[in-house]
Amino acid sequence: MNEVCEFLKKVGVYYIATVEDGEPRVRPFGTVNIFENKLYIQTGKKKACFKQMDGKVAEICAFKDGTWLRLTGTLVNDDRVEPQEDMLNHYPELKGMYKVGDGNNAVLYFKNAKAVFYSFGKEPKTITF
Protein backbone atom coordinates (compact mmCIF):
# COMPACT_ATOMS: atom_id res chain seq x y z
CA MET A 1 0.00 0.00 0.00
CA ASN A 2 2.85 2.39 0.76
CA GLU A 3 4.27 1.90 -2.73
CA VAL A 4 0.87 2.70 -4.25
CA CYS A 5 0.50 5.85 -2.16
CA GLU A 6 4.00 7.10 -2.95
CA PHE A 7 3.50 6.50 -6.67
CA LEU A 8 0.23 8.44 -6.68
CA LYS A 9 1.85 11.30 -4.75
CA LYS A 10 4.70 11.43 -7.28
CA VAL A 11 2.23 11.45 -10.17
CA GLY A 12 0.35 14.35 -8.59
CA VAL A 13 -2.79 14.11 -10.72
CA TYR A 14 -4.36 10.73 -11.31
CA TYR A 15 -7.68 9.76 -12.88
CA ILE A 16 -10.52 7.98 -11.13
CA ALA A 17 -13.27 6.13 -12.98
CA THR A 18 -16.76 5.62 -11.59
CA VAL A 19 -20.18 4.77 -13.03
CA GLU A 20 -23.32 6.91 -13.08
CA ASP A 21 -26.57 5.56 -14.54
CA GLY A 22 -24.62 2.92 -16.45
CA GLU A 23 -22.29 5.51 -18.02
CA PRO A 24 -18.57 5.83 -17.23
CA ARG A 25 -17.33 8.97 -15.50
CA VAL A 26 -13.62 9.82 -15.29
CA ARG A 27 -12.16 12.83 -13.51
CA PRO A 28 -8.79 14.07 -12.25
CA PHE A 29 -7.97 13.78 -8.55
CA GLY A 30 -4.90 14.65 -6.54
CA THR A 31 -5.38 13.63 -2.91
CA VAL A 32 -4.07 10.39 -1.46
CA ASN A 33 -3.03 9.55 2.07
CA ILE A 34 -2.50 6.58 4.37
CA PHE A 35 -4.26 6.78 7.73
CA GLU A 36 -4.61 3.88 10.17
CA ASN A 37 -3.21 1.53 7.54
CA LYS A 38 -5.87 2.43 4.96
CA LEU A 39 -5.43 4.29 1.67
CA TYR A 40 -7.69 7.37 1.56
CA ILE A 41 -8.76 9.89 -1.05
CA GLN A 42 -10.80 13.05 -0.49
CA THR A 43 -13.72 14.82 -2.19
CA GLY A 44 -16.86 16.78 -1.34
CA LYS A 45 -20.14 15.13 -0.41
CA LYS A 46 -22.02 17.67 -2.53
CA LYS A 47 -20.26 16.48 -5.70
CA ALA A 48 -21.80 13.91 -8.02
CA CYS A 49 -18.63 11.83 -7.80
CA PHE A 50 -19.19 11.23 -4.08
CA LYS A 51 -22.50 9.52 -4.82
CA GLN A 52 -20.76 7.46 -7.52
CA MET A 53 -17.99 6.41 -5.11
CA ASP A 54 -19.53 5.86 -1.69
CA GLY A 55 -19.76 2.11 -1.15
CA LYS A 56 -19.06 1.37 -4.81
CA VAL A 57 -16.17 0.04 -6.85
CA ALA A 58 -13.95 2.62 -8.53
CA GLU A 59 -10.67 2.48 -10.43
CA ILE A 60 -7.71 4.84 -10.41
CA CYS A 61 -5.28 5.04 -13.31
CA ALA A 62 -1.98 6.92 -13.12
CA PHE A 63 1.14 7.13 -15.32
CA LYS A 64 4.67 8.38 -14.70
CA ASP A 65 8.09 7.63 -16.18
CA GLY A 66 6.98 4.63 -18.23
CA THR A 67 5.06 2.98 -15.40
CA TRP A 68 1.32 3.01 -14.94
CA LEU A 69 -0.87 1.94 -12.09
CA ARG A 70 -4.41 0.61 -12.03
CA LEU A 71 -5.94 0.56 -8.56
CA THR A 72 -9.37 -0.99 -8.14
CA GLY A 73 -11.44 -1.38 -4.99
CA THR A 74 -14.55 -0.43 -3.07
CA LEU A 75 -14.52 3.09 -1.65
CA VAL A 76 -15.88 3.45 1.88
CA ASN A 77 -16.78 6.83 3.36
CA ASP A 78 -15.28 7.51 6.81
CA ASP A 79 -17.15 10.27 8.65
CA ARG A 80 -14.79 10.32 11.62
CA VAL A 81 -12.99 13.56 12.48
CA GLU A 82 -9.51 12.01 12.69
CA PRO A 83 -9.10 10.92 9.05
CA GLN A 84 -10.55 14.24 7.86
CA GLU A 85 -8.03 16.16 10.00
CA ASP A 86 -5.18 14.00 8.79
CA MET A 87 -6.09 14.47 5.12
CA LEU A 88 -6.40 18.25 5.48
CA ASN A 89 -3.08 18.39 7.33
CA HIS A 90 -1.45 16.63 4.36
CA TYR A 91 -3.26 18.91 1.88
CA PRO A 92 -3.50 22.30 3.63
CA GLU A 93 -4.44 23.99 0.34
CA LEU A 94 -7.86 22.31 0.68
CA LYS A 95 -8.60 24.03 4.00
CA GLY A 96 -10.07 26.99 2.11
CA MET A 97 -12.75 24.71 0.61
CA TYR A 98 -13.22 22.03 3.26
CA LYS A 99 -13.35 21.95 7.05
CA VAL A 100 -13.34 19.01 9.41
CA GLY A 101 -16.91 18.06 10.19
CA ASP A 102 -18.42 20.62 7.79
CA GLY A 103 -20.87 18.07 6.39
CA ASN A 104 -19.24 18.31 2.97
CA ASN A 105 -15.68 17.06 3.53
CA ALA A 106 -15.54 13.38 2.58
CA VAL A 107 -12.62 11.03 3.02
CA LEU A 108 -13.00 7.56 1.55
CA TYR A 109 -10.71 4.58 1.90
CA PHE A 110 -10.11 1.63 -0.40
CA LYS A 111 -11.42 -1.75 0.75
CA ASN A 112 -10.53 -5.03 -1.01
CA ALA A 113 -8.09 -3.11 -3.17
CA LYS A 114 -5.98 -4.50 -5.98
CA ALA A 115 -3.17 -2.39 -7.40
CA VAL A 116 -1.26 -3.47 -10.50
CA PHE A 117 1.88 -1.68 -11.69
CA TYR A 118 2.63 -2.08 -15.39
CA SER A 119 5.73 -1.18 -17.37
CA PHE A 120 6.70 -2.04 -20.94
CA GLY A 121 8.96 -5.08 -21.03
CA LYS A 122 8.35 -6.06 -17.39
CA GLU A 123 5.95 -8.40 -15.68
CA PRO A 124 3.08 -6.64 -13.89
CA LYS A 125 3.44 -6.25 -10.13
CA THR A 126 0.28 -6.81 -8.06
CA ILE A 127 -0.35 -5.51 -4.55
CA THR A 128 -3.54 -6.23 -2.61
CA PHE A 129 -4.73 -4.56 0.56
Model-inferred region functions:
Residues R25-R27:
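Short, well-ordered alpha-helical segments enriched in acidic and aromatic residues
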Residues E6-E20, A58-A62:
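A short, Trp-centered hydrophobic/proline-enriched beta-strand micro-motif
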Residues F29-G30, R70:
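Conserved beta-strand in the GNAT
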Residues V32-G66:
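A short mixed-secondary-structure module that forms the rim of ligand-binding clefts
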